[in-house]
């Protein structure tokens, strides 16, 4: 009996997961940009949504956020968690899915990691190692 073709594994999930995640990302970014969440903490911050990851069954969306300037991240996450029910309802209205995904918020730490690597690359020891050899022996 022939084996069924196994789809190639994608690092971020299937094409459908990636497509739905991007749609959810656009929806949540629009909601936050338009100031539709009436929370004093969120009204004082611009929040970026660089990534959303969907579970395989599309029932859970992990939304990575970063307040502009990188300050008060814990307060922003708490405010988003307090407004989770409203945000989930808004996502359900904007994204055409059988089930509205449950949502959870996480701080996107990629910016901090990139800054740490950039700082490391600028250290004198690394600069010395990266400099071209001028020794012609």
Swiss-Prot record:
It is found in: Cytoplasm. PROSITE patterns: RBFA. The keyword DNA repair does not apply. GO terms for molecular function: ribosomal small subunit binding. One of its GO terms (cellular component) is cytosol. Signal peptide: none annotated. InterPro entries: KH_dom-like_a/b, RbfA, RbfA_dom_sf, Ribosome-bd_factorA_CS. Keywords: Cytoplasm, Ribosome biogenesis. Transmembrane segments: none annotated. One of its GO terms (biological process) is maturation of SSU-rRNA. Monomer. Binds 30S ribosomal subunits, but not 50S ribosomal subunits or 70S ribosomes. One of several proteins that assist in the late maturation steps of the functional core of the 30S ribosomal subunit. Associates with free 30S ribosomal subunits (but not with 30S subunits that are part of 70S ribosomes or polysomes). Required for efficient processing of 16S rRNA. May interact with the 5'-terminal helix region of 16S rRNA. Belongs to the RbfA family. This is Ribosome-binding factor A.
